């Protein structure tokens, strides 16, 4: 569903409203469905898996980036997660207050803040991520397994192309 209308209804209505415009309807369909799919999966995982651990999507992304790259500079977490440093600061304060991460100033450059998981944070991610992955598997359950590698490659290509446009 796309709001109260089905995807088919929405796409037909868009075609009817915008049919006279000289636009690339296939590009619009790909990007709008990519956006819808990403939001649907994110909302599902937030309501189910992440809610059980009292985590927002942003808090999960912070924990994920730290889990994979620790120790990691706070600016790298913001870049990897795609959110502002101000947003990151509030989320990290909450995660630190819950005993899931620690922040320390770099001994080489006092302006840099290094972030690591605590033992409690690592334990949470080790428990949470298999549950999260079950949700990921449910989200793609209706796709042909033999197409998943190609699909992932296509999504990577979209990401790389969009990211390369930032520099232009």
How would you describe each model-predicted region?
Residues 93-153:
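Charged, amphipathic alpha-helical coiled-coil/dimerization segments
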Residues 58, 86:
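Key DNA-contact positions within bacterial/archaeal DNA-binding proteins
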Residues 35, 39, 64-68, 129:
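Short, locally clustered residues in the helix-turn-helix/winged-helix DNA-binding domain
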Residues 69-73:
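Short capping segments at the starts of secondary-structure elements
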Residues 51, 79, 96-97:
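Alpha-helical residues within the helix-turn-helix
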Residues 1-51:
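N-terminal leader segment of winged-helix/HTH proteins
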Residues 59-63:
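Short alpha-helical "packing" element that flanks the helix-turn-helix/winged-helix DNA-binding module
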